[in-house]
Amino acid sequence: MSEKRKDNRGRILRTGESQRKDGIYQYRYADILGTRRYIYDADLNKLREKEKYVQKQLDQGLDYANGKMTVVELYEQYVDTKRNARENTKKTYAYFAKVLRNDAFSKKEISKVKPLDAKKWLIKLHDSGLSYGTLKVLKAAVGGAFKMACEEDIISKNPCAFSLSSIISNDTTKKEVLSLEQQKAFLSFVRKDAWGSKYYDVIIVLLNTGMRIGELSGLIIDDIDFEKRRIKIDHQLQYYDKNGYVVEKVKSRSGNRMIPMSDDVYESLKRVLNNRKQIEREFEDYVFLNRNGRPITSTAFAISLKRIITKYNNCHQNDQLPNITPHSFRHMFCSNMVKANMNAKTLQYIMGHADISMTLNVYSHIDYDAVEKSMLDILNADN
């Protein structure tokens, strides 16, 4: 019978345990893949507590060694699997990595992160000034990383599997839109304004198609069928300081669609193509160009739109318009169609939404007058 291994204090060591010359205790085990692993501690009793935890993880089929990686290390591994993401999404991932690194939460071992830890972290970020909308996207990204860890059997539960609204009030304000009367007044002003009139057709197309500004920027002549009066949407054009113009896919498969042309849109597109002057050869197929012959960008148009709104408000002291963005026209289009009782599935298709709840809950801005008219038109139809 072999002699039991003992430490320098005469205590019997268990299978897998040993003591190094420097007095540190170590425990050797095989992980779920059969790879040899070690854990260490200067105190034998504390080492045995670690052994129990390791064994519990192994019994559950979890990877203890990878469970010791930190939150930010897990997040970086998760982001590395998203190499096909759009440039905007990559920039968002990079920003969130920076937010993570600036907080002690990022250094916690993922196997030790509890839902309470994640909740406290998000509340702390909200108190520091991050908006509910930003935190919602951040939680989805970090939660996605923890979900990946669950799928890889590194941890058993996702500590971010809770609703953000359960810990933080949704203080997101609805995007500003113009009423139908304001839309008419604004379009009339833009059409007559010496400087703003060059954006009239851009606004007409956005307001009457519901397309995104990136989709409008990316329109090429072949996307427009004047005979059948329809516009093909299957890509968008973005501009990045680092990469310049980048053609990207639409946001989802549902984003591939055909949008019918109204008479106003038909006339605006004809006018835009007939009035093009200076055109860079590289961009000759694009429809909406700036004065330098290059495709318009969302940033440049947003700046110009703000200038037009300011000019309008200076001329209409008693009828001020809210600050709107290029994307506001998409919201207005959706609201206008809902008020006109367009079929919900038809509107979902035109908007390019994968989920109809996005069409009805986020983009439609219905006021009481519209609700009253819709209801009474139905109830009084037979009177």
Regions found by a protein language model. Give the residues of each.
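DNA/chromatin major-groove-contacting recognition/catalytic segments
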Residues: F186, K242-E248, A340, N361, ...
